[in-house]
Amino acid sequence: TPTQYHNEGFKHPDLRYCGDINANVPVPVFFAFDLESLLSMEDVSFSEKSQAGGGCQLCNTLEEFSQFNFDQIYNNRWMQNIDEEKKYRQAELITKGPFSINSCLYAILCRNEVEKITLLNLLRTESPKSYSKYKDKIKVCKENMFECNGLYITDCRYFDGKASIAFSNTYEKRSYINRYKKTELRPLEATIDFDWVSAKTLINRQSTKFQINYETQSGVQFSGLCKPKNAKTLYTKIIIEGHLMCFMGQQLVEAALL
């Protein structure tokens, strides 16, 4: 998307684009659609360039579509003429009125396995019907679709009374910090909940508040977690500055991630 580089998060509040506190998508998810199905729908138009700023001619025939400059549209190399080349990279498909994603949804793409499982657990607990409907379409994206230049959870595991959480520590994240940091970054406020469950019944919850050094911290470990006698599953939720970043489940008997 046009602002993905800046908005893909979690971005520290002091690094957000133009100081906008809302310029932050903590856990990005992409919907991938079947192009042939999209183009075959009634009332679908397409443009070779972005419609922003006065727009570009809208087309709706196969002949017009075949004349598009796809070398520019799919070009991911360094831009020589930013203003012009960016317009091509924002080519659009447009439909009139509401659009039902079910008509041509191909996949729902997540950044990594932790975020995939988080989405599945949210759907399963909040909307079982949606979980059944979309679970087979939710996948980890294997392509270079995400910027990976913010803070996110890369691993979350429990073993022998200890929980280990790993944070992203990518070159892209460090580069973004170096480019846009103007002042010392305050620690982020976070909460982790450990829910011990048996047959969907909550037996015990342990909650801990902690802080995260956005620049340097690669992980955190929690010890002294006492498993209740009848607990069969441990659900772990991590919330950073009010945003749910991780929702993992682990079967305690079989040590399998849910």
Model-derived regions, located:
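A positional/architectural concept
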Residues: 257-258
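Active-site-proximal loop/hinge segments that shape catalytic or ion-binding/gating pockets
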Residues: 2-211, 218-219, 223, 230-237, ...
